[in-house]
């Protein structure tokens, strides 16, 4: 199952890039506060590369990974000096690095059938192994308050050459389903496409416990610097113990 095909990827970048762009200054300050002012940052679920572009401008090397080929095509245009590859964050080979980020509830998406609580534990262990001592993992995720509590929630947005309608419904106590209809102008007509996204919701306590079991020291976050998370989004900072060597 794939998500963020060509039209939704375009719309997400055109109309919803603010999350990554607004979070970037706070994210950079967190990196710097832990002595990470250069080196390789791996961005899991990099989307259209807006955060990767900010990292490159700040002097970091960047590897962005996303399951959507359409997003990766956009990212290569947005941040041509970064490296990108198509892949699932649940299975892609991670290189040794100084920091790993996953911004915008990427850990919740169930495009890959391997996604889930057990896979999350494996992912955190993989990240811990590849991080340099003193390296960090920064991520945010959707929790139970992201659910509309079994009431249908609809959202409509539009731009110069696009429109999108998303309907979100709870699917059991720990997941939500989004039905997304996109309309994108192609020539003199609008093309309609549909996608269905399923997200598994996580409690902050279970994320923190899994990180600690993987070896991280853990801090919870309400946002990245001055950028505050919207309702239902929570963040964590995982720190690999040890002195930085670079």
Predicted regions and their residues:
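Class I SAM-dependent methyltransferase SAM/SAH-binding core
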Residues: 49-91
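Conserved class I S-adenosyl-L-methionine
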Residues: 1-36, 38-45
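A short SAM/SAH-binding and catalytic strip from SAM-dependent methyltransferases
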Residues: 98-118
């Amino acid at each position: 199952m794939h998500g963020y095909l060509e039209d939704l990827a375009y719309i997400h970048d055109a109309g919803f890039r603010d999350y990554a762009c607004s979070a970037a200054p706070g994210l950079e300050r967190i990196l710097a506060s832990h002595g990470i002012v250069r080196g390789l940052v791996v961005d899991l679920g990099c989307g259209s590369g807006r955060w990767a572009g900010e990292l490159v401008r700040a002097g970091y090397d960047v590897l962005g990974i996303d399951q959507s080929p359409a997003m990766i095509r956009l990212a290569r245009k947005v941040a041509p000096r970064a490296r990108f590859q198509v892949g699932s964050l649940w299975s892609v080979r991670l290189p040794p690095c100084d920091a790993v980020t996953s911004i915008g509830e990427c850990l919740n998406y169930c495009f890959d059938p391997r996604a889930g609580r057990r896979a999350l534990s494996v992912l955190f262990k993989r990240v811990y192994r590849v991080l340099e001592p003193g390296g960090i993992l920064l991520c945010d995720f959707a929790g139970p308050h992201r659910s509309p509590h079994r009431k249908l929630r609809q959202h409509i947005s539009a731009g110069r050459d696009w429109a999108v309608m998303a309907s979100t419904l709870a699917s059991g106590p720990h997941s939500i389903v989004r039905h997304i209809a996109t309309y994108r102008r192609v020539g003199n007509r609008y093309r309609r496409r549909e996608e269905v996204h399923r997200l598994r919701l996580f409690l902050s306590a279970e994320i923190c416990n899994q990180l600690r079991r993987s070896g991280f020291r853990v801090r919870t976050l309400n946002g990245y610097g001055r950028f505050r998370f919207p309702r239902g989004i929570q963040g964590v900072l995982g720190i690999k113990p040890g002195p930085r060597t670079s």
